């Protein structure tokens, strides 16, 4: 089996319909408006966000989040993944009445259990929500910087790309950077190339979540390649959410050809009827990537991972026999 690594997945968005159904039974909740026939049901980006939030609302305790992380990571490992980074949202935790620390500790419990069962290594990226404003993002950054949890190794920002300008959030990222956290920011998904450029100018990330609309500006693509910024690309998500109309129009092959460092990711997998394994299969089928190139993409993900060098070396040691075989 092809070994894989993922850098871009939202943990609340990774809850399978089966797990959400079990949580609904636990809390006596009605999920018929957003899960039908054992699958998530939504029609557009607005109703997707509603379904996402309704599913997330059914995780309310430290034990619930431990179960969520353990279940997802075991599923990921079964598909060949040896490493996972996922985005966490202190804002979702607080909406559920859980402190950010208890939320993080719960997720960490699940991560430890999944590693014991499968060997999968994983880390958390704390995220602020862009459309909640700079103060909320700074609050998330302060938590990330101060929690000192060994499995929290990055800070990022998700949410509505059209809300505010990256410069408004620069201070939050400075807080995280000074604490030694890796930096990633969502840009170039629903915002155009100018969104990616502004993120590079004002946030100075080592990675960009999505970033695919950089393709609209050839000079920007060259800059991304020259600076070695890693793009966390989510092809199935991009097509399902109509960022691009079909895989044949997705710029992944052009980004690779331009020398950009790219990775493959599932974003919110059950919502988009995907998985990390499917993302790799899509790249092979629609982008013409052979096994050597797919292994190189996994290597890029490990190179860009927010881990200590001992962990990185151990991940490469697992990947090396596969690459050489």
Swiss-Prot record:
Cysteine disulfide links: none
CDD domains: ADA
Location of the active site: 189
Binding-site positions, Zn(2+): 8, 10, 186, 267
Recorded GO MF terms: adenine deaminase activity; zinc ion binding
Known cofactor(s): Zn(2+)
Keywords attached to this entry: Hydrolase, Metal-binding, Nucleotide metabolism, Zinc
Highest taxon, organism lineage: Bacteria
Catalysed reaction, written as an equation: adenine + H2O + H(+) = hypoxanthine + NH4(+)
Classification via SUPFAM superfamilies: Metallo-dependent hydrolases (SSF51556)
Enzyme Commission designation: 3.5.4.2
Site (Important for catalytic activity): 210
Amino-acid positions noted as binding substrate in the UniProt annotation, renumbered to this chain: 268
GO process annotations (BP): adenine catabolic process; hypoxanthine salvage; nucleotide metabolic process
Any Pfam family hit: A_deaminase
Free-text remark on how the cofactor is bound: Binds 1 zinc ion per subunit.
Matches recorded under HAMAP family: Adenine_deaminase
NCBIfam families per UniProt: aden_deam, PRK09358.1-3
Described function: Catalyzes the hydrolytic deamination of adenine to hypoxanthine. Plays an important role in the purine salvage pathway and in nitrogen catabolism.
UniProt record similarity statement: Belongs to the metallo-dependent hydrolases superfamily. Adenosine and AMP deaminases family. Adenine deaminase type 2 subfamily.
Entries under PANTHER family matching the protein: ADENINE DEAMINASE (PTHR43114:SF6)
Protein name according to UniProt: Adenine deaminase
Organism in which the protein naturally occurs: Chelativorans sp. (strain BNC1)
């Amino acid at each position: 089996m092809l070994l894989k690594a993922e850098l871009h997945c939202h943990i609340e968005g990774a809850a399978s319909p089966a797990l959400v159904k079990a949580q609904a039974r636990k809390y006596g909740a009605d999920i018929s408006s957003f899960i039908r026939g054992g699958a998530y049901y939504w029609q557009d980006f607005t109703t997707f966000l509603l379904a996402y939030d309704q599913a997330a609302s059914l995780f309310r305790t430290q034990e619930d989040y431990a179960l969520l992380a353990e279940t997802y990571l075991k599923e990921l490992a079964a598909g060949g993944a040896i490493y996972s980074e996922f985005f966490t949202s202190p804002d979702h935790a607080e909406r559920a009445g859980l402190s950010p620390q208890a939320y993080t500790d719960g997720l960490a419990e699940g991560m430890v259990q999944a590693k014991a069962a499968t060997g999968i290594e994983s880390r958390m990226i704390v995220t602020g929500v862009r459309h909640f404003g700079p103060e909320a993002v700074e609050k998330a950054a302060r938590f990330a910087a101060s929690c000192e949890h060994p499995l929290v190794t990055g800070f990022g920002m998700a949410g509505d790309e059209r809300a505010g300008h990256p410069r408004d959030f620069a201070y939050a990222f400075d807080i995280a950077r000074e604490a030694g956290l890796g930096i990633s920011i969502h840009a170039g998904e629903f915002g155009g190339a100018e969104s990616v450029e502004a993120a590079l100018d004002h946030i100075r990330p080592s990675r960009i979540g999505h970033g695919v609309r950089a393709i609209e500006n050839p000079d920007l693509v060259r800059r991304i390649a020259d600076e070695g910024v890693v793009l966390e690309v989510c092809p199935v998500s991009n097509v399902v959410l109509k960022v691009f109309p079909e895989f044949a129009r997705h710029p992944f092959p052009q980004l690779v050809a331009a020398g950009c460092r790219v990775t493959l990711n599932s974003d919110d997998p059950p919502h988009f009827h995907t998985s990390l394994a499917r993302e790799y299969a899509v790249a092979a089928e629609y982008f013409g990537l052979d096994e050597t190139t797919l292994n190189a993409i996994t290597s890029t993900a490990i190179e860009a991972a927010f881990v200590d060098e001992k962990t990185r070396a151990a991940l490469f040691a697992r990947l090396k026999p596969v690459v050489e075989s």
